[in-house]
C-alpha cells in the first residue's frame, strides 16, 4: 500500500451462518474468519490514513441472498465504498491432515485489468511476507480460471467470484487462506 495516500480497505470475513465454510477440529471456518477480520480491523484502525470497513461483524450474511449473489454483493459494497482493496479471509481444509500454510488467491495477469492483477499480487506478497514473519508457512499464490467465462478481451475469467468481480469492478480483491482447519496445529 502506498503510505502517502489515504486508503479505504474492505475486510471480508468469508462465509457466514447461512453460507457455512470448512469444519475441522471443532472449528467453524466462518467463526475463525470473523475473528481474523476483527483482529485485522483493530490493527489497521491504528493508522490515521486507513479507513477500514467490514462486510460483516457478526455471524449474519451480508444480505439475504444465495451464495453467488452474496459474493457479488461484497464486491459491490467495495465499489460503493470506493475501496482501494477488498481482502477476503478464509481457512482451508484438506484430506491430508498434516497440510499447513497460508495461500493467496489472486487475479492472474489476463491482460484485461493489469492494474488489478499487479496490485493484488503485490498486496498478496506483502501480506504473505507478514504471515511468514509470524511463522506461518507459505503455500504461495493460487491462480485459477473458469473454462466457460471470459473477460471482454477474450481471456479466461478468474474462477473465484471475489477475485473476478474485483477485476471487473477495478478493485484489487484477493482471498487469503490462513491455514487448515483439518490440521490440529
Residue ranges and their predicted role:
Residues 34-185:
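Active-site-proximal helix/loop segments of hydrolytic enzymes
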Residues 12-25, 183:
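Glycine-rich N-terminal loop/short-helix segment of MobA-like nucleotidyltransferase
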